[in-house]
């Protein structure tokens, strides 16, 4: 009897392992391939379907926002560009009209706005509806960052409130205001989050916490709505003014190693394709994608690697 018990305890794990290898792994692999490579192609909307769609892009005065605006304008969309710097927005609009002969002055709406102010958010939506009577795509791109060593805050956590106001609460406010219009048009929201919203990262407790809040809100909202597509984008390091404007707590400019940064144009191309294919979440770096899969299995390893990578991205 004892001998049979030994055989059972040795044999049962072996049977389970055989079951996993021979049945579960092949099914899981096929499902992974279908979800990540086949289904997006089947869902992909043709470029021609974007003609006359109404698009709002925040943080559009430079970088990713400006590149997205240009590319949506080329697709024939009616584009609203929003930012705090009116002069820079006008330059972006002028570049549209100069570079793309098919884009007319009336196709681009420029709105100056501080999205941490609810009145500016309301004004943005009212002007878009007044001009075009609908909203099809919203790109929430405005944001700010900071590098802070938590132990050196000296009692002042205002930078945390500032980051949350722009990176999180402004997105919630704007989404609330456009929600009914997007439901009517079966529209899309593109949220520019960050890898800092996927991984806790050294020196980025303020920025990372705001981006984790963004991820939580829009993943939850996706479960509430059937008529609005939500695509969350997690870029890596992009060659934009965002990094040029990044400062430490004492106001000093942060020097970055930009050798492996992605261009804003390449980033924008991937974002537009992800929305066309109905992608739920776009992680734009290979390291980020691998880390996302491994985080649940090897959390200590991922913490070590993110700390090393984050520290190496800042010049000493």
Swiss-Prot record:
The active site is at residue 207. It is a single-pass type II membrane protein. SUPFAM superfamilies: NAD(P)-binding Rossmann-fold domains. Substrate binds at residue 194. GO terms for molecular function: oxidoreductase activity. Its EC number is 1.1.-.-. InterPro entries: NAD(P)-bd_dom_sf (IPR036291), Sc_DH/Rdtase_CS (IPR020904), SDR_fam (IPR002347). PANTHER family: DEHYDROGENASE/REDUCTASE SDR FAMILY MEMBER 7B, DEHYDROGENASE_REDUCTASE SDR FAMILY MEMBER 7B. This is Dehydrogenase/reductase SDR family protein 7-like. It comes from Dictyostelium discoideum (Social amoeba).
């Amino acid at each position: 009897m004892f001998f049979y018990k030994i055989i059972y305890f040795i044999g049962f794990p072996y049977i389970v392992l055989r079951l996993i290898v021979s049945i579960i792994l092949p099914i899981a692999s096929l499902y992974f391939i279908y979800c990540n490579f086949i289904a997006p192609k089947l869902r992909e909307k043709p470029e021609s379907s974007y003609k006359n769609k109404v698009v709002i892009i925040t943080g559009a005065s430079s970088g990713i926002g400006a590149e997205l605006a240009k590319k949506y304008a080329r697709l024939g969309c009616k584009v609203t560009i929003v930012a705090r710097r009116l002069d820079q927005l006008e330059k972006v609009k002028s570049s549209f009209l100069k570079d793309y002969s098919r884009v007319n002055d009336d196709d681009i709406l420029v709105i100056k706005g501080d999205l941490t102010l609810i009145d500016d958010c309301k004004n943005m939506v009212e002007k878009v509806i007044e001009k075009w009577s609908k909203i099809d795509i919203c790109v929430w791109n405005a944001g700010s960052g900071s590098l802070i060593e938590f132990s050196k805050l000296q009692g002042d956590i205002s930078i945390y409130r500032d980051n949350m106001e722009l990176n999180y609460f402004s997105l919630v406010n704007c989404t609330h205001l456009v929600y009914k219009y997007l439901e009517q048009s079966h529209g899309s929201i593109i949220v520019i989050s960050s890898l800092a919203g996927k991984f806790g990262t050294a020196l980025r407790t303020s920025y990372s916490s705001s981006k984790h809040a963004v991820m939580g809100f829009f993943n939850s909202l996706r479960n509430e709505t059937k008529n609005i597509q939500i695509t969350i984008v997690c870029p890596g390091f992009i060659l934009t003014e965002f990094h040029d404007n990044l400062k430490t707590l004492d106001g000093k400019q942060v020097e970055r190693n930009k050798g492996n940064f992605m261009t804003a144009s390449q980033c924008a191309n991937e974002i537009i394709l992800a929305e066309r294919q109905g992608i739920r979440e776009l992680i734009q770096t290979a390291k980020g994608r691998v880390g996302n899969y491994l985080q649940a299995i090897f959390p200590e390893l991922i913490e070590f690697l993110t700390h090393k990578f984050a520290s190496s991205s800042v010049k000493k």
